[in-house]
Amino acid sequence: RADTQTYQPYNKDWIKEKIYVLLRRQAQQAGK
């Protein structure tokens, strides 16, 4: 599975995870 993710770095799950982390960072900054 690692090879698949490396071959297709822009997976739906990958994008979801990136967006999720991004939103969490923004939420934390806004909370502070």
UniProtKB/Swiss-Prot annotation:
GO molecular function: methyl-CpG binding
Gene Ontology cellular component list: methylosome; nucleus
One of the GO biological process terms: defense response to bacterium
Domain of life of the source: Eukaryota
SUPFAM superfamilies: ERH-like (SSF143875)
Keyword annotations from UniProtKB, A to Z: Antibiotic, Antimicrobial, Cell cycle, Nucleus
Locations listed in the record: Nucleus
Gene3D superfamilies, per database record: Enhancer of rudimentary
Keyword Nucleus: yes
Residue ranges of coiled coil: none
Family: Belongs to the E(R) family.
Assembly and oligomerization: Homodimer. Component of the methylosome, a 20S complex containing at least CLNS1A/pICln, PRMT5/SKB1, WDR77/MEP50, PRMT1 and ERH. Interacts with CHTOP.
The protein's role, per its UniProt record: May have a role in the cell cycle.
Protein name: Enhancer of rudimentary homolog
Species, as recorded: Sus scrofa
Gene expressing this chain: ERH
